[in-house]
Structures are given as structure tokens and as C-alpha cells.
Amino acid sequence: MRAALPPARLLPLLLLLALLGAPAARASRAQSAAPPQPGAERQPRPPPGPGPGNATGTGSGEAAGGGGSSNSSGDALVTRISSLLRDLHTLKAAVIVACAFTAFLIACLLLRVFRSGKRLKKTRKYDIITTPAERVEMAPLNEEDDEDEDSTVFDIKYR
């Protein structure tokens, strides 16, 4: 069973939650504090008459019903667009946080790649030579012991 997250890992999560929550709280406070603007939320209403909900038996209920359904879908579209425009600051903040988090991840991965590349270039002792021969200089370390060719140790320098 895993224990609680260490503080070093918990801090970025708390920061992310604070960044996501702050614009939403600020927008809800601004909406409740701001007085309603005249004409901003005013929608043209269809004239009262026979519609799908209050059709009278005296006439063309089908014609009025068709006009009412197209108008209600238009109202739904206007309502959806106005709600998106109202929450624009929250959406903008969420996109900025997502982009910043993605940039942070890319930077971490690049740092990890460059650090691992430095580790691969360290001097390897007693290893198989995989570098092409024209880029390698080899000199025997034990020059005085030439009778046994199989046990010669070489000093390798890469160009």
C-alpha cells in the first residue's frame, strides 16, 4: 500500500488546482456583484399564440408548432453561445494552464534526455569497441610485456 504523496510532488498538484479554481471563483463573484446590463441578456420572445404547448382547437396548430420548434432550437443555440462567452475567462485560464503544464513536461523530458546523453559518453573500461576504427586511437598500456598478445590492455582515445 502506498503512503501519502511527498510534499515535493504535492506542491505542483496544489498549484494546478489553485490556478484552475481561481478564475472560476473570480468569474462567479463578478457575475453575482455586477448589475444586469440592459439589453445584454434580452432575447426577443415570440408573440403569444397557438403553439405546441397551448394549441387551441380553432385552427392551424401544425403551422404554429413548426415555427415554435425552429425558434426553440435557435434560442438554445443563442443560450449556448452566450454561456460560452460568459465563461470565456475561465476557458482562457484553463487553456493557459494546460499549455504551461505541457511546456513544463516537455522541458522535463528534454532535460532528462540531455542528462542521459552525458552519462553515455563516460569512459567505459573493459568494453567492446563499437566506434568506427578511423575515430579511435589505441595504444597498449603494458608495453613491456609483448610476448602474450592475447592479454594486452589498450588505452582508447576517441577523436
UniProtKB/Swiss-Prot annotation:
Disordered, as annotated region: 28-73
Cytoplasmic side: 112-159
One Gene Ontology term from the biological process aspect of the record: Golgi organization
Regions that span the bilayer: 91-111
Membrane topology value: Single-pass type I membrane protein
Database matches in PANTHER family: EXPRESSED PROTEIN, MEMBRANE PROTEIN FAM174B
The protein's name: Membrane protein FAM174B
Organism in which the protein naturally occurs: Bos taurus (Bovine)
Taxonomic classification: Eukaryota, Metazoa, Chordata, Craniata, Vertebrata
UniProt gene name: FAM174B
